[in-house]
Regions:
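Generic low-polarity alpha-helical segments
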Residues: 6-7, 164
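Hydrophobic beta-strand core residues of beta-sandwich domains
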Residues: 5-6, 134
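Solvent-exposed, non-transmembrane regions of membrane-associated and secreted proteins
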Residues: 20-205
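A cross-taxon signal for low-complexity, glycine/charged-rich
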Residues: 1, 7-13
Length: 205
């Protein structure tokens, strides 16, 4: 039971508080929540600008380029879904710091275009928010840090527990998995993951 409900039930709220206080407090609470959400999205957008610059430099120079001096990761790929105009830069590794600023290339999975299952993970409310709009049959382009681009076709989705994905990164197939938390609209962390599976079409010249 929250404090607003308990006060109202005892009559303290309605009898001793001015009528404008409740709407005012609700408005303040809303601004705080909106501000927190706005900060998260603003950080995500700013990070992608810096990551895009670092990724462009990485392709041009062939050297790992950090997006900012204190970063412990660097951009390794760009994921694009042209039909829905979605694009995001991927960072090396899936640590908490990496995922705070962009999708992460999950450790011990191959690069896009290589044999096996390349896995990229990101938060559902920022960088992989667009996954809810990806349809079966959509083409997904992944550009690596060496400048090579590979095209995949989305062919299925699944809901799995985080510790029981069933993904075999050493598969003989050429596949891509984009992973995020499930359900999309949840406000608290949970054990389930949404997986978008895609099969390699081939390199893009």
């Amino acid at each position: 039971m929250d404090c607003f409900a308990s006060l109202a039930m005892t009559g303290v709220w309605t009898d001793q508080m001015p009528r404008f206080v409740l709407p005012l407090l609700l408005a303040i609470a809303g601004l705080i929540l909106f501000g927190q959400g706005g900060y998260i999205h603003a950080k995500a957008l700013l990070a992608q600008v810096l990551l895009e610059r670092a990724f462009t430099e990485t392709i041009a120079t062939g050297r790992e380029t950090k997006p900012w001096s204190w970063a412990d990761t660097w951009p390794v790929a760009r994921i694009e879904v042209r039909r829905i105009h979605a694009s995001t830069i991927v960072l090396a590794g899936s640590s908490g710091q990496a995922l705070a600023f962009g999708p992460g290339h999950v450790e011990n999975t191959p690069d896009a275009g290589e044999r096996g299952v390349a896995v990229y993970s990101a938060h559902r409310d920022t960088h992989f928010r667009f996954l809810r709009d990806v349809a079966i049959g959509d083409e997904i382009d992944v550009t690596r840090s060496d400048g090579r681009k590979f095209r995949y076709r989305a062919d299925s989705t699944s809901i799995v527990r985080f510790d029981a994905s069933g993904i075999d990164p050493l598969s003989n197939k050429y596949e891509l998995v984009l992973s995020t938390c499930w359900p999309f609209e949840a406000l608290t962390p949970g054990p389930d993951r949404y997986l978008l599976h895609a099969s390699l079409i081939g390199p893009v010249s």
